[in-house]
Amino acid sequence: MSVFAGRYAGRCAIVTGGASGLGKQVAARIIAEGGAVALWDLNGDALAATQAEIDATHVVALDVSDHAAVAAAAKDSAAALGKVDILICSAGITGATVPVWEFPVDSFQRVIDINLNGLFYCNREVVPFMLENGYGRIVNLASVAGKEGNPNASAYSASKAGVIGFTKSLGKELAGKGVIANALTPATFESPILDQLPQSQVDYMRSKIPMGRLGLVEESAAMVCFMASEECSFTTASTFDTSGGRTTF
């Protein structure tokens, strides 16, 4: 994928789920294109390794479902970066892959706590820093599962549908304030999150993609990096697909 030198010059970003997968890929591109990044992730060891690898300015090991931890991290990262222009919410889990009537209640709640409540906490605590400067770009990671629903993935599908609705509301609230908020709705792409799923579920999701393959993390990262840039200036409260033709709405 191409690197656009200077696209993020002077810009400062917070990336959740930044130690691996899409979050790491996006953070690396923002840094390569002139920006500064604070990484948030639950995995402290992976976070330290990624910081050393991509030269991130600041890191915070936290659970995004802990509101107090997110509030503290937002203040610490804003201080370390000097400001916050960009928020990429990429932290998430898949949960169990079973029918609704067999879904463990605690597992369902955990998926909602991380994928939806945690994303809300991150947006809630970071947006005020953007409003102070009259500029911001927010990318919340949703999924085609939030549009269509995947069988045996009710918690994940529900959480991502919530992210889409949440982001549409937020984008409208921020319209005219210099802060743009959109959601990415990818189909399944190669990333560590697939390790949480049985191969049968991965095969099912691949079969739904007209292009006949899983996406590459670099492909979704390229879309996110457009969404998080100044170039994305007249689209807000919307969704961007990287689905290989699976969804067209």
Curated annotation (Swiss-Prot):
Q: In which pathway does it act?
A: Carbohydrate degradation; L-rhamnose degradation
Query: What reaction does this enzyme carry out catalytically?
Result: 2-dehydro-3-deoxy-L-rhamnonate + NAD(+) = 2,4-didehydro-3-deoxy-L-rhamnonate + NADH + H(+)
Which domain of life does the protein's organism represent? Bacteria
Q: What is its EC number?
A: 1.1.1.401
Outline the subunit composition: Homotetramer.
Its function? Catalyzes the NAD(+)-dependent dehydrogenation of 2-dehydro-3-deoxy-L-rhamnonate to form 2,4-didehydro-3-deoxy-L-rhamnonate. Does not show any detectable activity in the presence of NADP(+). Catalyzes the fourth step in an alternative pathway for rhamnose utilization that does not involve phosphorylated intermediates.
Name assigned to this protein:
2-dehydro-3-deoxy-L-rhamnonate dehydrogenase (NAD(+))
Species name: Sphingomonas sp. (strain SKA58)
Q: Organism classification, top ranks?
A: Bacteria, Pseudomonadati, Pseudomonadota, Alphaproteobacteria, Sphingomonadales
